[in-house]
Design a protein with these regions (language model features):
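Pyridoxal 5′-phosphate
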Residues: 1-274
Length: 274
């Protein structure tokens, strides 16, 4: 931050140095996520990535269909994006979650039609910790040639296995894995076209105008590497915390809403009953 503080979009020496480091970070991240560097778009947060994936894809591909599938238990940024698309004429299908807190692959299969252009689901619930089988769902979505799949992996990244290669669009955020706030990304398959939501420059392949926050995005490569390398240790720590939380809640007249199975500890939703 102190040495390479230049604007990576500038032509002067400091700018070129920052740009080189930024692209090195992009390439390293792409290698870890099993994709090409041009499939990594840096953003400021998961909410922005979700909006870019959902609204950006829908607006750019409306000629492919008008139907979008999601669930009734998404992050608020996804819900807001869906509400906006609905207000301008898109058909949004909100699948109800099961008692285990997830959407099943068959739910998506039954809801898909020839007019469906996008399915967007959260991988791990930020409220209950329920884990939706996004790998199975991606396989179902890809049986429809005009439909793509977006997964919000903000809560799952670095904590559970993610089928990176199966996801057409994927959201993650640095601060959920002990990285810097203000740093996130959208993984986008290179053949997909998005409508930019921020105008004013050619940064991020023309997908996000404005000066790039080079220091935090450069640091993101190391943040991701440490998260993936330490995933098993993180899982063990979360399991221990989850047991502690679960045992503690049993001491109170509380009703538990988190599923016992297919849940990422220590997420534990409960409410004290009168």
């Amino acid at each position: 931050m102190l040495d390479e503080y230049g604007n990576p979009d500038s032509l002067h020496q400091q700018g070129r140095k920052a740009a080189k480091l930024l692209e090195q970070s992009r390439s390293r991240i792409a290698s870890m996520l099993k994709c090409s560097p041009e499939e990594i778009l840096f953003t400021s947060c998961a909410s922005e990535s979700n909006s870019m994936a959902i609204v950006g894809y829908a607006l750019a591909n409306r000629n492919r269909g008008n139907r979008i599938i999601t669930s009734n238990s998404e992050h608020s940024s996804t819900t807001a994006a869906m509400n906006f698309l609905e207000s301008i004429g898109f058909e949004v299908v909100r699948l109800p979650i099961h008692e285990d807190g997830t959407i099943h692959a068959k739910d998506v299969q039954d809801a898909l039609t020839k007019d469906t252009l996008l399915v967007s689901l959260i991988h791990v619930s930020n409220e209950t910790g329920a884990i939706t089988p996004i790998g199975e769902i991606a396989d179902v979505v890809h049986t429809h040639p005009t439909c793509v799949f977006h997964a919000d992996c903000t809560q799952s990244f670095g904590k559970v296995d993610i089928p990176f290669e199966k996801l057409d669009l994927m959201t993650m955020s640095a601060h959920k894995i002990h990285g810097m706030k203000g740093s996130a990304l959208l993984k986008k398959k290179k053949n997909l076209v998005l409508q930019p939501l921020i105008f004013g420059g050619q940064q991020e392949q023309g997908m996000r105008g404005g000066t790039e926050n080079a220091p935090v995005h450069i640091a993101l490569a190391k943040t991701i590497r440490l998260a993936l390398e330490g995933q098993k240790q993180t899982q063990a720590q979360m399991k221990k915390s989850g047991i502690t939380s679960s045992n503690g809640s049993m001491k109170f007249p509380a009703r538990t809403f988190s599923p016992r199975k297919m849940r990422l500890p220590p997420f534990f939703a409960s409410a004290l009953m009168p």
